[in-house]
Amino acid sequence: KPRILCEMLEITDETWRNAVEGYLNTQRFYVLVEPEHFDIALGIYEKLRREKKAYGVGLINSGKLEEYDIAPAGSLATVVESKSIYAKRYVNMVLGKVHMCKRVDELKQYPVSITPNCMRYQNHVASAIRPEIYTTPFIGKNAFKVQYEQALQKKEDLNRQKIECKDRMTHMEVTLQWLEWDDDTDVKYRITIVSELK
């Protein structure tokens, strides 16, 4: 049965959640099948591509990952677990080369490294991963719960903004009433009143 990688993983140290989510980025959504089903899945994917129904989805060839049974010490792969040997091997391959650094000044000591707050160093370039990539979690069984809580918070924030906007509109409507006039003689008086309404 095809599975999405992020649903098969758990992060064991929340300090490094953002780094794992951010570094994997779109790879979190790659599809994983058992090695014996890869060719069939690839054929289906190719058919969908020809029909212009699927693009940009990664299909992991799990049969080629035998050498990645162990997560290298100090690597980002050490904080990710999976019940699937194939998912764990893939994570070991991708995150096993990424060294965890607690401070930014340690980054350049390794070819590929990352801090908990997502400052990444790779190919002799330091860069910050955009927060929108990792702010919403997708990895692990609690990811949907966190997404739901984030959605509720966003709804609450939007409702508060809506109330604030309505209050401002009401205030503006009152102010505009004072600007309406029939004769030019009222202009000076009304401008004085408007300034007092602030």
Q: Where are these predicted regions, by residue range?
A:
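Hinge-like oligomerization/junction regions that interrupt long coiled-coil arms in large cytoskeletal
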Residues: 1-163
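Extended alpha-helical coiled-coil "stalk/arm" regions
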Residues: 156-198
